[in-house]
Amino acid sequence: MSHDSDDKTFPYQKDDAELRRRLTPMQYEVTQHAATERAFTGEYTDTEDAGIYKCVVCSTPLFESGAKFHSGCGWPSYFKPLNGEVIDEKVDYSHGMVRVEVRCNNCGAHLGHVFEDGPRDKTGLRYCINSAALNFESRPENE
């Protein structure tokens, strides 16, 4: 699934040639063509350090480490984004399923999907995000 047919215009317009130079092939395929990295292979799947997860394309802060949890699905999982403005959600009918795709609301980069099987004592949501779509910025817990 590519975002080429999507009508939404995002604030950050990215140059494809520059992205191909700057991103790894996996980062490019995940963020620009909605590919999915293999389960349990992502750099941030088991990261427990305090910090902020940012969009690999435009550096928009997306998730805090305090919202991360171990879901056992093989991808980094969060029960909420940093705030309600950073994520764009779109119904995804690919692969014979109906899911909700999660994209960066600044640049449109594909991040992953959101499911309603997250921690019930939090939001009940599980944002299942590809590590390849993220950069992690370590921060002390109290910041």
Curated annotation (Swiss-Prot):
The keyword Chloroplast does not apply. The keyword Zinc applies. Its cofactor is Zn(2+). Keywords: Metal-binding, Oxidoreductase, Zinc. Binds 1 zinc ion per subunit. The zinc ion is important for the structural integrity of the protein. One of its GO terms (biological process) is protein repair. Its EC number is 1.8.4.12. Residues 16-139 form the MsrB domain. One of its GO terms (cellular component) is cytoplasm. GO terms for molecular function: peptide-methionine (R)-S-oxide reductase activity; zinc ion binding. InterPro entries: Met_Sox_Rdtase_MsrB, Met_Sox_Rdtase_MsrB_dom, Mss4-like_sf. It catalyses: L-methionyl-[protein] + [thioredoxin]-disulfide + H2O = L-methionyl-(R)-S-oxide-[protein] + [thioredoxin]-dithiol. It is an enzyme of class 1 (oxidoreductase). It holds the Pfam family SelR. Coiled coil: none annotated. The active site is at C128. Zn(2+) binds at C55, C58, C104, C107. PANTHER family: METHIONINE SULFOXIDE REDUCTASE, METHIONINE-R-SULFOXIDE REDUCTASE B1. NCBIfam families: peptide-methionine (R)-S-oxide reductase MsrB. Belongs to the MsrB Met sulfoxide reductase family. This is Peptide methionine sulfoxide reductase MsrB. It comes from Burkholderia cenocepacia (strain HI2424). The lineage of its organism: Bacteria, Pseudomonadati, Pseudomonadota, Betaproteobacteria, Burkholderiales. The gene is msrB.
